[in-house]
């Protein structure tokens, strides 16, 4: 389920109901909590939906084993759903937590800074090495246009760059196929 519209946060209680969730666990950082997390918590309070949350206290968040551990150490085992509030790093951490917990997962995007919202992998740092790990694929992606439009300029630029890189990487893949015989799949490209 993908919801991209003005006021999209208002749809979150209905999405939770569609997936029979009665107590979500919300993951955010200080910035994404102030941009959208606080509104989500207020909305859930008004609807009488119980939830638990963890807001990362640090400024420079990395998608590593320490960050996943912080969430796990604060995770409420009574929760039946995971809501990530943020973009790249929060998305990757939340997907990993949802996979480990065996729960459904929703991402609430706060900036169009990357294109991995629907991915079933997480870009993680393990022992200081960047790797891709299988993770939970979101059952819902929620993007409030008003929030996305007010994202910092550098995050808007990052998203544009991410989109451009996809086209360039496909061209490089084709060239590699022609020159070296590298496997190429038209369907994936």
Indicate where each model-derived feature is located.
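A glycine/threonine-rich phosphate-anchoring loop and its flanking beta-alpha core
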Residues: 101-189
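Short, electropositive, low-hydrophobicity segments enriched in small/polar residues
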Residues: 9, 90-92, 113, 120
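Residues that form or flank phosphate/diphosphate-binding pockets in enzymes
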Residues: 35-36, 92, 151
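Short beta-strand/turn micro-motifs composed of small residues
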Residues: 27-28, 86, 143
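Short, conserved acidic/polar surface loops in the N-terminal third of protein domains
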Residues: 63-67, 93-96, 117-119
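A short, small-residue-rich loop immediately preceding and capping a beta-strand
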Residues: 75-111
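ATP/NTP phosphate-donor binding region
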Residues: 1-81, 157-165, 171
């Amino acid at each position: 389920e993908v919801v991209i519209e003005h006021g999209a946060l208002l749809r979150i209680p209905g999405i939770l109901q569609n997936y029979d969730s009665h107590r979500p666990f919300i993951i955010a950082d200080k910035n994404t909590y102030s941009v959208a997390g606080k509104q989500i918590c207020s909305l859930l309070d008004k609807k009488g939906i119980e939830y638990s949350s963890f807001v990362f206290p640090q400024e420079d968040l990395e998608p590593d084993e320490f960050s996943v551990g912080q969430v796990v150490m604060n995770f409420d085992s009574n929760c039946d759903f995971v809501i990530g509030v943020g973009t790249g790093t929060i998305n990757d951490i939340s997907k990993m937590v949802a996979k480990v917990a065996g729960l459904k997962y929703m991402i609430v995007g706060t900036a169009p800074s990357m294109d991995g919202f629907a991915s079933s992998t997480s870009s993680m740092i393990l022992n200081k090495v960047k790797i891709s790990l299988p993770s939970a694929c979101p059952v819902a992606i929620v993007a409030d246009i008003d929030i996305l439009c007010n994202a910092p300029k550098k995050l808007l630029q990052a998203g544009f760059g991410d989109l451009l890189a996809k086209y360039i990487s496909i061209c490089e893949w084709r060239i590699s196929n022609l020159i070296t015989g590298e496997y190429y799949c038209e369907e994936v490209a």
